[in-house]
Structures are given as structure tokens and as C-alpha cells.
Amino acid sequence: MRFPSDLCPSSGTGELSARSQVRWRLCWENELELADHAELAEFLRKAYNPSGTFNARPFEGGRSWAGARPEVRAIGYDSRGVAAHIAALRRFIKVGAVDLLVAELGLYAVRPDLEGLRISHSMLVMYPALKELGVPFGFGTVRHALQKHLTRLLGKAGLATIVSGVRVRSTLRDMRLDMPPTRVEDLLILVFPIGRPMSDWPAGTIIDRNGPEL
């Protein structure tokens, strides 16, 4: 299955312009040079800083990942440098009592001046890599405040199913003696059918990452 371009309709000339000027690079983590990591770290730090300095802090010192390290990335470039980014990592999660192989998606960011470059465009670029990884599902988590936004961009186009009423248990990215080693969050789940239909997604009200989020 491939995602046709009409699943991401343009809302105006501004969005068309943003899409046409961005050049996408799909790369494995081992292909990135030190300069790539430094550039991505600066981009992600600026992208996540508006949501709080705590969220931007992991990207200090040239580190281009926050928790678990990604396996493959889709990076959009334009004349100003990095314009957009999304990453994926294969891992087993436990959905209820079922162990399930997924490609976790995360580290999504778009430069503020390119608001027309939607997450659906990033997924079109990432999709061939997810097929190559041989996973049944793509998996991501987002805050409840983004539900309407993501339903408009992904759900209505059929790119993903948004699942609510699920708690996600993860390990902290860094061990601290003054905090529990795991945390449980009430999040929205994004499920992208890749090699299997959505009907094969297991039922369950808690998901164990058994590791840090991407």
C-alpha cells in the first residue's frame, strides 16, 4: 500500500510553496555525520523550547535525540537549513498482554515559518522506510490537547487511527535517585497501519514501552 498524494490536500498556495521548496533526506542513523547531529540538535532545541526549557534541554551539547535514539530519520531541508524532522525506532511494546513489534515515531518538528508543512507530508516520506523496516504498525504518542489538530491532519485522511483511553508506561531517559525509574502517562495513541490492518491492533488500556520514549 502507498499513500497517494491526494491524501494530503493543499489548503492554499502558501502550503504548496512550502512543500515545493523542501528537499527530503531519508537516512539511517549511522549515515549521520557529527555536523548533521549538531545541526539537528540546534533545530530540535529551538523547536521544543516554546513548550518549556525542560523539553529543549536534551538537545544541548549537539545531542540530536531526547530519549531512545532513533534508527531512521526523515529530514527536510530548504535554503535556510533544516526545515522539518521526524524519526523512527523499531521496538517491542506490550499492549495489554500482547508483545507487539512497532516502529515508534517521534522527534517530530517543523520550523515555525513553515506551518503549511503538515505532519502528513513527513509521513509520506517516512512510509517507505517503515515498509523496509518490516513492521506491522507505526506507533506514536501525543498530548490530548492535539487531538482535534491530528484528527484533521491524519485521522480524516486515513493515515492513522487515534486511540484514547490508554496509559503509557515508560522508563525515564536518565536515572535519578530522587525519582521513580518509570512514569505512567495518559496520552493519545497514534497507530499507523503498515504491514497489518488496524483490526489487528491488540486491545488494552495500558502500553508498556519498557524503555524511554523516542
Swiss-Prot record:
Top EC group: transferase
EC number: 2.3.1.-
Cellular component terms per the entry's GO annotation: cytosol
MF-aspect GO terms: acyltransferase activity
Statement: the UniProt record of this protein carries the keyword Flavoprotein: no
Pfam families hit by this protein: NodA
Domain of life (superkingdom): Bacteria
InterPro entries documented for this protein: NodA, Nodulation_prot_NodA_CS
Family according to the record: Belongs to the NodA family.
Protein name, per record: Nodulation protein A
Name of the gene this protein is made from: nodA
